Design a protein with these regions (language model features):
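PP2C/PPM-type serine/threonine phosphatase catalytic domain
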Residues: 1-273
Protein backbone atom coordinates (compact mmCIF):
# COMPACT_ATOMS: atom_id res chain seq x y z
CA UNK A 1 0.00 0.00 0.00
CA UNK A 2 2.02 2.92 -1.29
CA UNK A 3 1.22 6.48 -2.22
CA UNK A 4 2.74 8.19 -5.24
CA UNK A 5 5.45 9.71 -3.03
CA UNK A 6 6.58 6.22 -2.01
CA UNK A 7 5.32 6.35 1.58
CA UNK A 8 3.54 3.24 2.87
CA UNK A 9 0.25 2.84 4.71
CA UNK A 10 -0.53 0.24 7.38
CA UNK A 11 -4.02 -0.44 5.97
CA UNK A 12 -6.60 0.83 3.49
CA UNK A 13 -8.05 3.14 6.14
CA UNK A 14 -4.65 4.80 6.60
CA UNK A 15 -4.77 6.03 3.01
CA UNK A 16 -7.45 8.59 3.98
CA UNK A 17 -9.32 8.14 0.74
CA UNK A 18 -6.27 8.29 -1.52
CA UNK A 19 -5.75 5.57 -4.12
CA UNK A 20 -2.71 3.32 -3.61
CA UNK A 21 -0.29 3.38 -6.51
CA UNK A 22 0.48 0.32 -8.66
CA UNK A 23 3.86 1.65 -9.81
CA UNK A 24 6.31 -1.22 -9.24
CA UNK A 25 9.21 1.22 -9.56
CA UNK A 26 8.35 2.43 -6.06
CA UNK A 27 9.27 -0.96 -4.60
CA UNK A 28 12.14 -0.85 -2.14
CA UNK A 29 13.08 -4.41 -3.11
CA UNK A 30 15.63 -5.33 -5.77
CA UNK A 31 16.52 -8.62 -7.44
CA UNK A 32 18.48 -10.24 -10.24
CA UNK A 33 18.62 -13.59 -12.04
CA UNK A 34 21.69 -14.56 -14.07
CA UNK A 35 22.66 -17.89 -15.61
CA UNK A 36 26.36 -18.37 -16.32
CA UNK A 37 28.17 -21.64 -17.11
CA UNK A 38 25.17 -23.82 -16.19
CA UNK A 39 24.84 -22.16 -12.79
CA UNK A 40 21.85 -19.96 -11.98
CA UNK A 41 22.66 -17.02 -9.72
CA UNK A 42 19.77 -15.26 -7.98
CA UNK A 43 19.66 -12.41 -5.50
CA UNK A 44 16.88 -10.61 -3.63
CA UNK A 45 17.36 -7.49 -1.53
CA UNK A 46 14.94 -5.64 0.74
CA UNK A 47 15.67 -1.95 1.26
CA UNK A 48 14.79 -0.51 4.66
CA UNK A 49 11.89 1.90 4.16
CA UNK A 50 12.45 3.94 7.32
CA UNK A 51 15.27 5.78 5.52
CA UNK A 52 12.57 7.76 3.74
CA UNK A 53 11.87 9.61 7.01
CA UNK A 54 15.45 10.90 6.88
CA UNK A 55 15.10 12.16 3.33
CA UNK A 56 16.96 9.18 1.83
CA UNK A 57 15.50 7.17 -1.05
CA UNK A 58 15.46 3.60 0.37
CA UNK A 59 15.48 2.09 -3.14
CA UNK A 60 18.98 3.25 -4.04
CA UNK A 61 21.10 1.07 -1.73
CA UNK A 62 19.46 -2.31 -2.53
CA UNK A 63 19.49 -1.54 -6.25
CA UNK A 64 23.17 -0.62 -6.16
CA UNK A 65 23.95 -3.80 -4.20
CA UNK A 66 22.01 -5.93 -6.69
CA UNK A 67 23.75 -4.35 -9.67
CA UNK A 68 27.17 -4.79 -8.05
CA UNK A 69 26.43 -8.49 -7.47
CA UNK A 70 25.55 -8.91 -11.15
CA UNK A 71 28.75 -7.19 -12.21
CA UNK A 72 30.76 -9.41 -9.88
CA UNK A 73 29.14 -12.53 -11.35
CA UNK A 74 30.00 -11.36 -14.87
CA UNK A 75 33.65 -10.97 -13.87
CA UNK A 76 33.95 -14.03 -11.58
CA UNK A 77 31.05 -16.47 -12.15
CA UNK A 78 32.75 -19.24 -10.16
CA UNK A 79 32.62 -17.33 -6.86
CA UNK A 80 30.45 -18.56 -4.00
CA UNK A 81 27.39 -16.46 -3.01
CA UNK A 82 29.15 -15.13 0.11
CA UNK A 83 32.18 -14.12 -1.96
CA UNK A 84 29.93 -12.37 -4.48
CA UNK A 85 28.15 -10.45 -1.72
CA UNK A 86 31.44 -9.49 -0.07
CA UNK A 87 32.85 -8.00 -3.28
CA UNK A 88 29.60 -6.24 -4.14
CA UNK A 89 29.30 -4.78 -0.64
CA UNK A 90 32.84 -3.40 -0.75
CA UNK A 91 32.12 -1.80 -4.13
CA UNK A 92 28.89 -0.16 -2.94
CA UNK A 93 30.54 1.00 0.29
CA UNK A 94 33.14 2.90 -1.74
CA UNK A 95 30.30 4.70 -3.53
CA UNK A 96 28.99 5.97 -0.15
CA UNK A 97 25.32 5.45 -0.94
CA UNK A 98 23.18 6.10 2.16
CA UNK A 99 20.70 3.37 3.01
CA UNK A 100 20.56 -0.26 4.05
CA UNK A 101 19.22 -3.59 2.89
CA UNK A 102 18.88 -7.25 3.71
CA UNK A 103 20.36 -9.67 1.16
CA UNK A 104 19.91 -13.24 -0.01
CA UNK A 105 22.02 -14.81 -2.77
CA UNK A 106 21.74 -18.29 -4.27
CA UNK A 107 23.82 -20.25 -6.76
CA UNK A 108 21.93 -23.28 -8.08
CA UNK A 109 23.25 -26.16 -10.18
CA UNK A 110 21.60 -29.47 -11.02
CA UNK A 111 22.58 -31.04 -7.71
CA UNK A 112 23.44 -28.27 -5.26
CA UNK A 113 22.10 -25.03 -3.86
CA UNK A 114 24.63 -22.68 -2.25
CA UNK A 115 23.29 -19.72 -0.31
CA UNK A 116 24.31 -16.60 1.58
CA UNK A 117 21.56 -15.00 3.67
CA UNK A 118 21.80 -11.85 5.75
CA UNK A 119 18.60 -10.63 7.38
CA UNK A 120 15.06 -11.85 6.90
CA UNK A 121 14.65 -12.73 3.24
CA UNK A 122 13.80 -16.40 2.89
CA UNK A 123 14.41 -19.45 0.73
CA UNK A 124 12.40 -22.66 0.76
CA UNK A 125 12.87 -25.88 -1.21
CA UNK A 126 9.57 -27.59 -2.06
CA UNK A 127 10.20 -31.30 -2.51
CA UNK A 128 8.04 -34.28 -3.32
CA UNK A 129 7.85 -36.75 -0.40
CA UNK A 130 9.22 -39.70 -2.37
CA UNK A 131 12.56 -37.93 -2.92
CA UNK A 132 15.55 -38.64 -0.68
CA UNK A 133 16.22 -36.02 1.96
CA UNK A 134 12.60 -35.04 2.51
CA UNK A 135 11.79 -34.56 6.17
CA UNK A 136 8.46 -35.66 7.59
CA UNK A 137 5.90 -32.88 8.00
CA UNK A 138 2.59 -33.39 9.71
CA UNK A 139 -0.57 -31.46 9.05
CA UNK A 140 0.46 -30.37 5.55
CA UNK A 141 -2.07 -31.19 2.84
CA UNK A 142 0.17 -30.17 -0.06
CA UNK A 143 1.98 -32.75 -2.19
CA UNK A 144 5.36 -31.12 -1.58
CA UNK A 145 7.05 -30.66 1.78
CA UNK A 146 8.56 -27.21 2.45
CA UNK A 147 12.17 -27.47 3.57
CA UNK A 148 13.42 -24.23 5.10
CA UNK A 149 16.98 -23.54 4.02
CA UNK A 150 18.03 -20.40 5.91
CA UNK A 151 16.67 -19.00 9.17
CA UNK A 152 16.01 -15.30 9.76
CA UNK A 153 18.69 -13.18 11.40
CA UNK A 154 17.22 -10.53 13.68
CA UNK A 155 18.73 -8.05 16.11
CA UNK A 156 15.28 -7.73 17.62
CA UNK A 157 11.69 -8.23 16.54
CA UNK A 158 11.20 -6.65 13.10
CA UNK A 159 14.83 -5.48 13.09
CA UNK A 160 16.75 -7.74 10.71
CA UNK A 161 20.47 -7.86 10.09
CA UNK A 162 21.29 -5.50 7.22
CA UNK A 163 24.13 -4.14 5.15
CA UNK A 164 24.30 -0.38 4.84
CA UNK A 165 26.12 2.90 4.89
CA UNK A 166 25.46 6.23 6.58
CA UNK A 167 27.39 9.49 6.33
CA UNK A 168 27.54 9.62 10.13
CA UNK A 169 29.06 6.21 10.80
CA UNK A 170 29.92 4.57 7.49
CA UNK A 171 29.23 0.84 7.75
CA UNK A 172 29.71 0.61 11.55
CA UNK A 173 25.99 0.69 12.52
CA UNK A 174 25.32 -2.31 10.29
CA UNK A 175 26.33 -5.91 9.78
CA UNK A 176 28.91 -7.13 7.26
CA UNK A 177 28.70 -10.03 4.78
CA UNK A 178 30.78 -12.08 7.23
CA UNK A 179 27.73 -12.10 9.54
CA UNK A 180 25.57 -13.89 6.97
CA UNK A 181 24.34 -17.47 7.18
CA UNK A 182 26.05 -19.51 4.47
CA UNK A 183 25.79 -23.12 3.41
CA UNK A 184 24.88 -25.66 0.78
CA UNK A 185 22.04 -28.15 0.43
CA UNK A 186 21.49 -30.89 -2.16
CA UNK A 187 18.73 -30.40 -4.71
CA UNK A 188 17.00 -33.00 -6.85
CA UNK A 189 15.14 -33.05 -10.14
CA UNK A 190 11.64 -31.53 -9.82
CA UNK A 191 12.52 -29.57 -6.67
CA UNK A 192 10.99 -26.10 -6.68
CA UNK A 193 12.96 -23.33 -5.00
CA UNK A 194 11.13 -20.26 -3.71
CA UNK A 195 13.16 -17.28 -2.56
CA UNK A 196 11.59 -14.01 -1.53
CA UNK A 197 11.78 -10.88 0.54
CA UNK A 198 9.97 -10.91 3.87
CA UNK A 199 6.81 -9.53 2.25
CA UNK A 200 6.01 -13.12 1.27
CA UNK A 201 6.96 -15.06 4.40
CA UNK A 202 5.59 -12.43 6.81
CA UNK A 203 2.16 -13.03 5.27
CA UNK A 204 2.13 -16.57 3.90
CA UNK A 205 2.92 -19.63 6.03
CA UNK A 206 5.26 -22.28 4.59
CA UNK A 207 2.38 -24.76 4.38
CA UNK A 208 0.39 -22.29 2.28
CA UNK A 209 3.38 -21.67 0.01
CA UNK A 210 3.42 -25.43 -0.65
CA UNK A 211 -0.34 -25.47 -1.30
CA UNK A 212 -0.08 -22.61 -3.81
CA UNK A 213 2.69 -24.58 -5.54
CA UNK A 214 0.35 -27.58 -5.75
CA UNK A 215 -2.40 -25.45 -7.27
CA UNK A 216 0.03 -24.05 -9.83
CA UNK A 217 1.30 -27.50 -10.82
CA UNK A 218 -2.27 -28.68 -11.50
CA UNK A 219 -3.31 -25.52 -13.37
CA UNK A 220 -2.84 -24.39 -16.98
CA UNK A 221 0.17 -22.38 -15.72
CA UNK A 222 -0.91 -19.20 -17.49
CA UNK A 223 0.36 -17.31 -14.44
CA UNK A 224 3.81 -17.99 -13.03
CA UNK A 225 4.21 -19.48 -9.57
CA UNK A 226 5.97 -16.30 -8.47
CA UNK A 227 2.97 -14.23 -9.58
CA UNK A 228 0.56 -16.46 -7.68
CA UNK A 229 2.64 -16.24 -4.52
CA UNK A 230 2.85 -12.45 -4.80
CA UNK A 231 -0.93 -12.27 -5.20
CA UNK A 232 -1.42 -14.54 -2.18
CA UNK A 233 0.92 -12.39 -0.09
CA UNK A 234 -0.84 -9.18 -1.09
CA UNK A 235 -4.28 -10.62 -0.35
CA UNK A 236 -3.26 -11.86 3.08
CA UNK A 237 -1.37 -8.65 3.88
CA UNK A 238 -4.66 -6.72 3.60
CA UNK A 239 -6.66 -9.22 5.68
CA UNK A 240 -7.30 -7.75 9.13
CA UNK A 241 -9.28 -10.78 10.31
CA UNK A 242 -6.64 -13.53 10.11
CA UNK A 243 -3.30 -13.27 11.88
CA UNK A 244 -0.33 -13.61 9.55
CA UNK A 245 2.98 -15.25 10.53
CA UNK A 246 4.21 -11.70 11.23
CA UNK A 247 1.29 -11.03 13.59
CA UNK A 248 1.83 -14.31 15.45
CA UNK A 249 5.52 -13.52 15.94
CA UNK A 250 4.65 -9.98 17.02
CA UNK A 251 2.39 -11.26 19.78
CA UNK A 252 5.10 -13.65 20.95
CA UNK A 253 7.22 -10.52 21.41
CA UNK A 254 4.45 -8.63 23.27
CA UNK A 255 3.69 -6.44 20.25
CA UNK A 256 -0.01 -6.05 19.59
CA UNK A 257 -0.41 -6.58 15.85
CA UNK A 258 -3.30 -8.28 14.08
CA UNK A 259 -3.89 -9.42 10.53
CA UNK A 260 -1.44 -9.07 7.69
CA UNK A 261 1.70 -7.03 7.14
CA UNK A 262 1.55 -4.75 4.05
CA UNK A 263 4.96 -4.67 2.41
CA UNK A 264 6.75 -4.87 -0.91
CA UNK A 265 6.94 -8.46 -2.17
CA UNK A 266 9.58 -9.91 -4.47
CA UNK A 267 9.47 -13.62 -5.32
CA UNK A 268 11.75 -15.69 -7.56
CA UNK A 269 10.94 -19.35 -8.25
CA UNK A 270 13.21 -21.97 -9.82
CA UNK A 271 12.48 -25.53 -10.87
CA UNK A 272 15.37 -27.99 -10.89
CA UNK A 273 15.55 -30.00 -14.12
Amino acid sequence: LKLEDGHSARSISDLNGAEPTTDVNLSEDAHFVRRVNNITHVGVFDGVGSWRKLGVDPRLYPRALSEACEETIEDRPSLRPDEILERAWRHVTKEEIPGSSTALLLSVSRSRLAYCSLGDCGVVVLRKPDVAGTAAHTGISATRAPLLVAAQQLRDFNLPYQLGWTNEGGTKPFEAPSNANVGTVPVFADDIIVMATDGLFDNVALETVAEVCDQWEHSDKEASLAELLCEEARRRSLDDAVDSPFALLAKENDVMWGGGMPDDVTVVCLEVS
